[in-house]
Amino acid sequence: MNKFSLFFALTATLMTITESAVPTASISAHVLDISGGSPAGGVQILAYIQQNDDWTKIGSEFTQDNGRVDWVSPDFTLIPGTYRLVYITEPYYKAKNVESFYPYVEVVFNIRDATQHYHVPLTLSPWGYSTYRGS
């Protein structure tokens, strides 16, 4: 096997491993700061599932520079239920020396089919936010 063939074989293997790291049954998130038209890197996202009358923490991740978290609960297998993502926004704006109204944003949603991928984006400004189920 020549050097180029070996390089391409290793690259293909690495890409396959990387692509399969996040399962289909997962929750991802994306935070966009619409006040500046940019991704919001460094925002902590806490993930919870409701069990009986309590919330059990299943993950804690920070958005990357591109504002994304590929998998908010990598150590938890999704099951049908009610979930909550808490986007901790105050430190993000404090680091920018910007006053904000919301110290955090909670998004509560139901998962009925735990085999699907769920994407929960948040568009954010110091004075408001919006969220939706993405793809």
Curated annotation (Swiss-Prot):
What is the annotated signal peptide range for this record? Answer: 1-20
GO molecular function terms attached to this record: hydroxyisourate hydrolase activity; identical protein binding
Q: Which InterPro entries match?
A: Hydroxyisourate_hydrolase, Thyroxine_BS, Transthyretin/HIU_hydrolase, Transthyretin/HIU_hydrolase_d, Transthyretin/HIU_hydrolase_sf, Transthyretin_CS
Which enzyme class? hydrolase
> What are the GO BP annotations of this UniProt entry?
purine nucleobase metabolic process
Enzyme Commission no: 3.5.2.17
Kindly give the SUPFAM superfamilies that the UniProt entry links to this protein.
Transthyretin (synonym: prealbumin) (SSF49472)
Residues recorded as binding substrate, renumbered to this chain, are: 30, 68, 132
Give a yes or no for keyword Ribosomal protein in this entry: no
Name this polypeptide is given = Probable 5-hydroxyisourate hydrolase R09H10.3
Species name for this entry?
Caenorhabditis elegans
